Amino acid sequence: MPYTPMMLQYFDIKNQYKDHLLFYRLGDFYEMFFDDAKTASRELDLTLTGRDCGMPERAPMCGVPFHSADSYIARLVAKGYKIAICEQTEDPALAKGLVKREVIRVITPGTVTESGMLNEGKNNYLCAVFFAGASAGLCFADISTAKVCATQITDGNITDKICSELAAFAPKEILSSADRMDYPEIYTFAKDRLGAFFDDTRNELFENGSFSELETRFGKEVFESHSLGAGSPAVLALDALIRYIRETQKVDLAYINSLEYYTNELYLGLDVNTRRSLELCETLRTKEKRGTLLWVLDRTKTAMGARLLRKWIEQPLVSVGAILNRQQAVSELVDSYIEKEELQNLLSSVGDMERLMTKIVYNTAGGKDMRALYQTISVLAPVKQQLKGMVSPELARLRDELDVLSDIGDYIDRAIVEDPPFSVREGGFIQRGFSPEIDELNAIQTDGKSWIASVEQSERELTGIKGLKIGYNRVFGYYIEVTNSYKDQVPDRYIRKQTLTGCERYITQELKDMEAKILGAKDKVCALEYEEFQKLREFIAGNVLRVQKAADILSKLDVYISLADVAGRNNYVCPEVDASDSILIKDGRHPVVEKFLKNEMFVPNDVNLNENERLMLITGPNMAGKSTYMRQTALIILMAQIGSFVPASSAKIGVVDKLFTRIGASDDLAAGQSTFMLEMTECAYILKNATSRSFIIYDEIGRGTSTYDGMSIARAIIEYTVSKKLYAKTMFATHYHELTELEDLCRGVVNYNIVAKKRGDELIFLRKIVRGAADESYGIEVAKLAGVPDEVVRRADKILANIDEHAPVDPKKNLMPKKEDAGAMTLGLETMLYEEVCEAIKKLDVNTLTPIEALGKLYEMKKSLEGAK
C-alpha cells in the first residue's frame, strides 16, 4: 500500500533536514511524525498519537498549536535540537490538490530571534572557529541584534586563548572546522562550562568561500585596515558564519552589514579562570547576575544598554585615550544631575530597537512592534535636546550623530493605530485617513452593520416576533434566529438553515446579498491593510542602517548614564588612568561586598604597587579578608579600564594589559585533575603569559601538596614573579609565614598583613591591611568561629603547643626545615599520645570496672598507641 500524497510530501522535505526536528504545518498545528514525534513526545511530555499514512500501521505523530509553538521550540532548542519550520506556502482554499509546503526557517541554539526565547539583557551568540595549525580565526554573531565580531589568534597556546574568547562571548552554538577530538579541551569547555551546542560536522561551510561577497557586505576598508585576505583564518570563520546564517534563516541578510574586527591588544586580557573567580557577570555557585560586578553597575534603562554594559565588562580597554574618552562622558553626566535624570526618564520608554529591526527584516513584526518602534523614535528628538549642552567629546559626538528618524516615525504614526491587534492578517490596524480605498471599504462594513441593525428592527415589527435577532458566525454567515415559541409566525420567505435546541436559524436572500457586500469589503480591507503594512515594513527595512546607528547611540548613552548613576549613588571617584606602571588606591572598597553589608561599614584599604614595591606578600588568618582585598583591587582596576568611576577616595591606575587570578582549590574532577595539579597548571599559564604590565593575584599557592613542597613552590613563584624576567604587579596571599623573609631577600617584595586581635578567647577581625608580617595565623580561633566542636579545638590547642615546643627557635633561619626537625615533630606527637593514655589510666575507677569493661579500655588504649606508629 503506497503512502498518501501528504506523507510523500513530508518525506521529501524531511530528507532535506535529516538531523532536524521537522515542524510540519497542518492547519492550526505543527505536526511531527515517526522518530521526530517520538523525540518531541519524550522531550516535551506530549501525547504520542498516530495518523493514517497509507501503510498498514499508523505513523507515530504528535503536535503543538502553531500560535503557542514558540514555548515548545524554546524548550527543544535549549536542549540542543535544531528545528526546521515547514509552513503552508499557499492558501488551502485556493490550492489545487495538495497544499504546497516548504521550510521557511531553521531555528538552532545560536540562531534564535524570537523575543520570548531570548534574555533581553544578554546577547545570543553564534560562533564559528576556523583552525589553521598554530593559528585560528573566530567569529561571533548575534543575529537578533546584527552584531558581528571577529578576531584572529596567531601565537602561543591557541587552546587557552580560544577558551578565553569563548568565555567572553559565551556563544550558544559553535561551528568548528576541526573535529572535537582534535581539540578536546575546547570541546569540553564549550559543552560543560558554557553549555554550548558544538557542531563539528559542517566542514563544507569553511570551504570555497566568497571573499568578494564579504567585502561587499561589510566594506573593503575593514579588511584592508587589518591586512585580512581571502585565506585569513578570521575571514574563513566569518564566511562560514554568514553562509550558515543564510542557510538557516532564508531571509535577506542586508541588515547584517557591520563587522567589528578586534585584536587581543585592544582589550584587557582575562582568561577563563579570572572571569569566573572575579564573578564579573555571573556568580560561581548559582550562575546568577545578583552578586556580580554587572549587578552593581547595571542601572541601564534599555535592553540594548544592558547588553552593551555586559560586553564592556567582559572586554575592558587598554588604550588610555579610549578609556579617558569614556571616563569624560561619565564624569560630565555625574556633574549634570538634572539632565541625567531627564535622560533616564526618556530612556525608560525606549524599546529594543535592535531586535525590533530584526523582526521587521524577518517579516515577523506586527502592528504592536511598529508602535513600539514609533515610541522609541519619538524619544530621539528630546534625547538630542537634553544633550545640547554637553561638551565632553564622546557625548558631543553621540548628540551630533544622532538621527531622530522623523520620517520613519511620521510614517508609522500616520499608518498604524495606537492600539493595533496582534495579527496583521485580519485588518483593523491601519489609521483612518491613511488610505482612501481602505476608508471606503470600512464605510461599507460600518454601513452594512447599521443596515443589519435596521433590518433586525424592521423584521421584528413585520413578523411580530419580539425576540427575533440577527447573528453571525463564520460557518453560516449572517442569520435570523427565532425561538421555538415563535416559529409558527415565521414568514415563508425565511429559509431554514439550522435547528438548535430551543430555536431555529433562518436566512433570507436580502440578508445574503448584504452579507456578500460586507464580507467582501472585509476581505478586501484585510488584503489592502496587509499590503500597506508590507510597504511600511519595506521602507523601514530599507533604512536599517539609520535605525541601527540610532540604536547604537542610545545603547552607549544608556551605559554612560548607568555608570554615572552608580557613581553618584555609591560615592565612587573618578580614577586617574595613565600609562604609568603603578596602582595606587586610597580607601578602596569591594564594589559587590559592600552592597551586602547592612549593619556594618565596609572597611576600606589602600594599595601601593609601584616600581619598587612590586609584590605584596599578604599574611593573616582565614576569614580576615585577604581574598576580598585582592579581588577588590582587581575589580577596581577592571572598572577603571571600562571607563567607570571606582569605589575609593582616590585612585591612580596605570593601565594593565592582562589580569590573572589563581584563587580557590576545588578539584576539577571532570577533567581528572587534582587540586594541586589544577593549581600548578593555572600557575604555569600565568607565568608563561604574564608581562611586566600585568596584575596577578595568587591566593594560597601550594596547599594541595606537602608543606615543604608547597612552600618551596610558592617561594620559587614569588622569586620568578619579581625577577627581571617578569616583574609583574602581584598580590600573593599565603599561610607560609616563613616566606615573609623574602622581603629582605628579593627586590620588590613587601610584607603586609590583615590585622586581627584577640580579646580573651574571642578573635576580632579588623579587616585592615597594614605593613609587616602577621605574628600569628589564628587558625584554631578561626576553627572555633566556624563551629568546630570544642573537643576538637582543645585537641588542636594541645597539638599546636607540642609542635611549638619542638619547633626551631627561629624558623626564619632555615626556610626549608631539615629532616631531623620533622622527626622531632613526629616524636612530639607520639609523646603526646602516651601522655594522653597515662591521663586516661589515672581517671579509671578500677573498683567499679568489670573484667569485660577493663579489657575493653585496654583494647582502646592499645589501638591509640598503635595508631601513633
What are these regions (language model features)?
Residues 1-332, 345-348, 352-361, 365-457, ...:
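Charged catalytic and DNA/RNA-contacting regions of genome-maintenance
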Residues 1-2, 8-12, 19, 537, ...:
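Conserved phosphate-binding elements of NTP-dependent enzyme cores
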Residues 34-37, 231, 301-302, 309-312, ...:
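ATPase nucleotide-binding head domains, primarily ABC-like/P-loop NTPase cores
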Residues 86, 109-118, 252, 390-394, ...:
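Active-site phosphate-binding and catalytic loops of NTP-dependent enzymes
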Residues 362, 366, 376-379, 397, ...:
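Charged, surface-exposed helical/loop "interaction arms" that form contiguous linear patches used
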Residues 500, 504-538:
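Extended, charged coiled-coil "arm/hinge" scaffolds of SMC/Rad50-like chromosome-maintenance ATPases
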Residues 832-869:
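C-terminal tails and terminal domains of large nucleic-acid-associated
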